[in-house]
Amino acid sequence: MPELPEVQAVVNHYKPVFLKQKIERISNPNSYSKVFATHTLPKLNKNVGGQLIKDVFRRGKYIVLQTEKGYLCIHLRMTGQLQESLDSFVADKHCSFAIHLNKGKTIYFKDYRKFGRLYYYSTLDTLNACLLYTSDAADEF
């Protein structure tokens, strides 16, 4: 699992790529549906399609894309990576989702072990509660 500085490096790299772009849609090249933790792909596209990305930041080990109506949260887990291009083998087999932006730009989520997840929340309250719960539980040990 990436450490916080590695997740922050991903945020720093992709913030200029995502910022002020509109999400056209999200696709699922390898048909692995468990990557979508909170919503099905059609419902996710209904929530984020056409939304402008207003900010990109890190919350814990989550990469958060703030849209006009909610938050798209990416957790890399063990082997997840965001990439701007993929060869066809990886796209077919290891690309769990792709975020299609306006102007023809696509960001791919490559995950060999399929542990990474994509979440959508209308507010950050649920994500914040999860992060507080896990850090509180860790303090007990």
Language model features with spans:
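Extended, highly charged segments
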Residues: 1-68, 89-91, 100-105
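Phosphate/anion-contacting hairpin/loop surfaces
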Residues: 68, 72-135
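A short, hydrophobic C-terminal helix/tail in secreted or cell-surface proteins
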Residues: 136-141
